Curated annotation (Swiss-Prot):
Protein name: 1-deoxy-D-xylulose-5-phosphate synthase
Catalytic activity entry: D-glyceraldehyde 3-phosphate + pyruvate + H(+) = 1-deoxy-D-xylulose 5-phosphate + CO2
Pathway this chain belongs to: Metabolic intermediate biosynthesis; 1-deoxy-D-xylulose 5-phosphate biosynthesis; 1-deoxy-D-xylulose 5-phosphate from D-glyceraldehyde 3-phosphate and pyruvate: step 1/1
Gene: dxs
CDD domains for the chain: TPP_DXS, TPP_PYR_DXS_TK_like
Length: 612
């Protein structure tokens, strides 16, 4: 008699999950996908990557024993299934919210989360270091890395060292043919052609059944298997990873749960003998038709119910991209480089319209900056579009290859200030501090459409030294009253005749301050140029006011406020300068209102400080 198919209506705890039969697991996969889609209906969440990795995440937790075996996701945002199965399903609706679950793996949240990550390409190095020096030899550490992230320079360095040291670790390559948007690079093209001989898999299966029972016979198994594998490679040829020295298995269908579980069970026994790679193919966005068909990255991270999903809402990024389109029409000598953030930086249309003027170099921030240096030396007018949090990865390249050579490259620094729901790994609050430590840097910040376009023109006209234009991901104000400014200028956002108190600030927070100040006798000065400001004009401002508050949505160290205090002291000015900024670098994640209040940079806290 045929049994009725068991329907799963609740995500089990991890202990019960390990006891489930295959047909139950398949039902659970359907429920997990529904949960992920439900989350994305109500908030901005990482949709496509989590839908694509459902079966792989389930298989890893089913075959291995977390937390004794550690499963670590590169970048970390593909962790929704991992969290739900490891006893956090009841809280999954709170993901990326204040006091809720993190959108990334987070050790402070659960023993099942090995490491906190957020940037791509670092997981192999972390896992190798842990495996080689961890005293508990019984633990397996399984890093999962995408086909885009593995092309990152740091990941390549790790692969080289892992192979050289013969580190016994299993690396899962989750190959979905996508980064956030379409993949680029030669390695992606090579990997798309990888295929493992079926005879190797069949031989391994037979050998394991016969010999993998006792410790002494395991050595015989391994010796025979290696010989057969070498013979197969002699006729078939080695792929890239095998040439480095990895035991390579794949390509398998990572969305086939039964096959993925079976292959992991077999490979699990081989890992102690040396570095091993399992290459799985998955479909990004599987289970949500629009996400499956999305080759642009529109469904990477979004709120499905957002009425602005398909709108042309004007952000700072879209203003910059649209203005550069006009500039390229005027001067075809312009070149734009972006490291893997074409869509989210709003450059997709420009990249299609001017393919010869635009290049996405993949997840390669260091390479992007140094390649820009080469283009500048070739007399191209270069713009680099890059997130603030990723710019910090290229510090040496900025110092050695750009600033030292005084090259006039423009950096459009996106996602500045706080990232809120993404958390600590994505806050753009450190760029001013580290950029100011590099000689010859021009640092600016825009607070509206007019300022951003004006700064792009000034950067385009700049003949020497790197020019940084900071902006947030927020909606870009298109102000009616446009105040012209020249290189190094500061402008009054609000001015009274009798006030002896002023706020100096810059960036998008200027707009919030302006609304709050209108009924108060306080002047508001927009420090468009954070460095290279007109010193005499700034000294005049410092001499005019008794109380000056420097409000910055950046980390306290080496900020504009520090410069102004030094400048006032050097010139023996009597003004009182107070810094209002971010003092805590353990910010976490959450809603804008909650995070601003926690850091005392919400409007109520700022004006309470001024009033006191």
């Amino acid at each position: 008699m045929k049994k009725n198919k068991v329907k799963i209506d609740k995500i089990p705890n991890y202990e019960d999950f390990k006891k489930m039969k295959l047909h139950e697991l398949l039902d659970l996969a359907v429920l997990l996908r529904k949960k992920i889609i439900d989350i994305s209906e109500n908030k901005s969440a990482h949709l496509s990557s989590n839908l694509g990795i459902v079966e792989l995440s389930m298989a890893l937790l089913y075959v291995f024993d977390s937390p004794q075996d550690l499963i670590a996701y590169d970048t970390g945002h593909q962790c929704y299934v991992h969290k739900m199965i490891t006893d956090r399903a009841d809280k999954i609706s709170t993901i990326r919210e204040s006091n809720g679950l993190s959108g990334f793996q987070e050790p402070n949240e659960s023993i099942h989360d090995f490491i906190s990550t957020g940037h791509s390409g670092n997981i192999l190095s972390i896992c190798q270091g842990f495996i080689e020096k961890n005293n508990s030899k019984s633990k397996s550490v399984i890093p999962v890395i995408g086909d885009a992230a593995i092309s990152n320079g740091l990941a390549f360095e790790a692969l080289n060292n892992i192979a050289y040291n013969k580190t016994p670790m299993l690396i899962i390559i989750n190959d979905n043919g996508m980064s956030i948007s379409k993949n680029v690079g030669a390695l992606h093209k090579i990997m798309s052609k990888f295929q493992m001989s079926k005879s190797v898999f069949l031989t391994e299966k037979i050998l394991r059944k016969i010999l993998f029972k006792k410790e002494w016979s395991k050595k015989i198994y391994w010796s025979i298997y290696k010989s057969f594998s070498k013979l197969s490679k002699f006729f078939k040829g080695k792929n890239f990873f095998e040439s480095l020295g990895f035991h390579y298995f794949g390509v398998i269908d990572g969305n086939n749960l039964k096959k993925t579980i079976n292959v992991l069970k077999r490979i699990k026994n081989i890992v102690p003998f040396g570095p091993t790679i399992l290459h799985v193919k998955t479909i990004k966005g599987l289970g949500y038709k629009e996400a499956e068909l999305d080759d642009k990255g529109l469904y990477h991270s979004l709120k499905l119910s957002d009425p602005n999903l398909n709108s042309n809402n004007q952000t700072y990024g879209s203003v910059a991209a649209n203005f550069l389109e006009k500039l390229i029409e005027y001067d075809n000598n312009i070149q734009i480089i972006n490291p893997a953030m074409t869509l989210s930086s709003n450059f997709l249309n420009l990249s299609k319209k001017f393919p010869n003027n635009y290049e996405d170099v993949g997840i390669a921030e260091e390479h992007a900056v140094t390649k820009a240096a080469g283009m500048a030396i070739a007399n191209k007018k270069v713009f680099v579009s890059i997130y603030s949090t990723f710019l910090q990865r290229s510090y040496d390249n900025l110092l050695h290859d750009v600033a030292r050579l005084e090259l006039p490259i423009t950096f459009l620094v996106d996602r500045c200030d706080l990232s809120y729901s993404d958390g600590d790994t994505h806050h753009g609050i450190y760029d001013i501090g580290f950029l100011k430590s590099i000689p010859n840097t021009i640092i600016t910040c825009a607070s509206n459409k007019f300022e951003l376009e004006r700064l792009i023109i000034l950067a385009y006209q700049n003949k020497s030294n790197p020019f940084f234009i900071r902006y947030t991901k927020e909606k870009c104000e298109d102000i009616e009253v446009k105040k012209e400014f020249s290189f190094g200028s500061w402008v009054y956002a609000l001015q009274t005749k009798e006030s002896k108190t002023c706020i100096i600030s810059y960036g998008d927070i200027i707009n919030d301050l302006k609304k709050e100040i209108k009924t108060k006798s306080i002047d508001l000065i927009n420090a468009v140029f954070i460095t290279n400001y007109q010193k005499e004009n700034v000294l005049r401002i410092l001499s005019t006011y008794k109380n000056i508050y420097v409000v910055e949505k950046v980390f306290d160290s080496n900020c504009l406020g520090d410069d102004l205090i030094i400048l006032a002291n050097e010139n023996k000015l009597s003004c009182n300068i107070k810094k209002i900024n971010i003092r805590n670098n353990k910010i976490g994640f959450g809603n804008k209102e909650d995070i601003d209040k926690k850091l005392n940079i919400d409007m109520n806290s700022i004006f309470a400080e001024i009033k006191s």
